């Protein structure tokens, strides 16, 4: 977890973090978003209770959601609206050519007022957002695992060492920053697995110590 936080800290200080508000540029006809009531020019404030601070957050939060319905909080003419959207699940490929089942709601996102707000953070703010990202990934992973146990999550998204190595090699071709980001996410996942109450893992040792 500490290693992941350090990686995010480095990225936010050196490269920066995006804070561009997300506005809906298009709502596709007959899409889940249109049926739920989303409209063009709605500003997305929250998804599943998590604040949307950047256009980049929208796709991430939709992808990480595991419940049947996704909760949207949007601003329309300075009024806050709360909508529940049941996403469609489509078989597709990610940017690296890996087959995935993707959750989509049928919206096209753009920058509010077409202004991009990408800033390099000072050490204190970078630390805050680094810890926040570690917390988000940890809680989302635990939520996903819980949904998988009860049969509500897509198990095709899981991958073993071979798949991780393959994806890591593909990501490395895009540069050091995307590679570091992926390593941070993997570090969090390994940290969680290490805490599971399984013999030979730290979680197993802690369980035995608790029994003693």
Label each residue range with its predicted role.
Residues 1-26:
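Internal alpha-helical transmembrane segments
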Residues 7, 58, 134, 198:
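Residue-level signature of catalytic and energy-coupling elements of molecular machines
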Residues 200-212:
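Transmembrane alpha-helical segments of integral membrane proteins
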Residues 91-192, 210-212:
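Functional transmembrane alpha-helices
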Residues 10, 35, 39, 45-46, ...:
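PDZ-domain C-terminal substructure recognizer with occasional recognition of PDZ-binding tails
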Residues 7, 11-16, 150-151, 173, ...:
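Short helix-capping/hinge motifs at transmembrane helix termini and TM-loop junctions
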Residues 33-55, 134:
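Conserved PDZ fold ligand-binding element
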């Amino acid at each position: 977890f500490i290693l992941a936080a350090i990686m995010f800290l480095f990225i936010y200080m050196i490269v920066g973090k995006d804070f561009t508000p997300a506005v809906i540029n298009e709502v596709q006809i007959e899409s889940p978003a249109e049926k739920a009531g989303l409209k063009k020019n709605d500003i997305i404030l929250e998804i599943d209770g998590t604040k949307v601070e950047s256009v980049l957050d929208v796709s991430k939060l939709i992808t990480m959601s595991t419940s049947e319905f996704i909760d949207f909080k949007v601003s329309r003419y300075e009024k806050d609206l709360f909508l529940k959207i049941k996403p469609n699940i489509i078989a597709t490929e990610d940017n690296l050519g890996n087959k995935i089942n993707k959750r989509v709601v049928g919206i096209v996102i753009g920058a509010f007022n077409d202004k991009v707000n990408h800033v390099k953070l000072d050490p204190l703010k970078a630390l805050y957002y680094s810890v926040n990202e570690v917390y988000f990934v940890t809680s989302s992973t635990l939520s996903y695992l819980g949904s998988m146990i009860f049969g509500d999550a897509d198990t095709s998204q899981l991958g073993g060492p071979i798949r991780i190595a393959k994806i890591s090699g593909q990501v490395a071709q895009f540069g050091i920053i995307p590679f570091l980001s992926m390593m941070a996410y993997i570090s969090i996942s390994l940290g969680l697995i290490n805490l599971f109450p399984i013999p030979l893992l730290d979680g197993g040792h802690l369980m035995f110590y608790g029994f003693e």
